[in-house]
Structure formats: C-alpha cells, structure tokens
Amino acid sequence: MADLYVGLVHYPIYNKRMNVIAGAVTNFDIHDISRTCRTYNVQGYYIIHPLEVQKQIIDKILSYWQEGYGKVYNPDRADALSRVLWQPDIASAVQTIVERTGKQPYVVTTDARIYPNTVSYSFMRKQLQEGDRPVLLL
C-alpha cells in the first residue's frame, strides 16, 4: 500500500480576478484538515506557503496545541497536529517525501476540469492500494 500525503497550497493560487496571490492560512486549514488526515492515516500534511509571517502563525498554533496548555486540554488534537508540516513551496514538500521514503511521489492535483494528463479515481485508488510509490495530493 502506498503512503498518502496531503498538501494545501496557499501560493501560487488565483483570486476571483485570476490574479496570482498568496492566500492566508486559517484555523480550519490547520485543525480540521489535520484531524481528517489522522483519521485516514495520511502520513504527512503539508501547509504550503512562502511567507515567513504565515509560517509564524502556523508555528504558534501548533506550539500551543502540541506543547502548551492545549496539549493537556486535548491530547488527541496534539496527535492529529503532529502530521502538520510547513513547506515554502511544492518542490520542498516533494523533497521531504523523497527524503522520508526514498521514492519520488506521484503529485496529484484536484480540478473540476479535464486535462490531457487527467487520471481517474479508479487509477489513483489502485495506486494507493497496490502501489509502493507515495502520493502527494494537492
């Protein structure tokens, strides 16, 4: 079975005017997605953002729940948040997976549109169930 990793990309993204922007990290991005990742045994959850100020926000929230009063108050949350890693860009997230597993991951992005390199759900399910190459879902 292949290892699954999730990455939430905050840059580069498009706003409603189709300008490239960096989105802000939210509490939801950190807490809720990390709990879902824990539930489905995702090996790592990367919050991808290039701005140092956003990394500081992520670090502060993680520190509270993993080292501060939050860890005592809700130890399950600390466990879920242990999968969260900040990376400045997608290439850095891919590199950490290569270093961890020794294998180049499939990088899969979601989109409602169909492209020439679009793969089916059944193809990716088979890769996860039968493959040994990690998958990074963005």
Regions flagged by a language model, labelled:
Residues 91-98, 118-128:
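A short, acidic, amphipathic alpha-helical segment used as a generic capping/interface helix at domain edges
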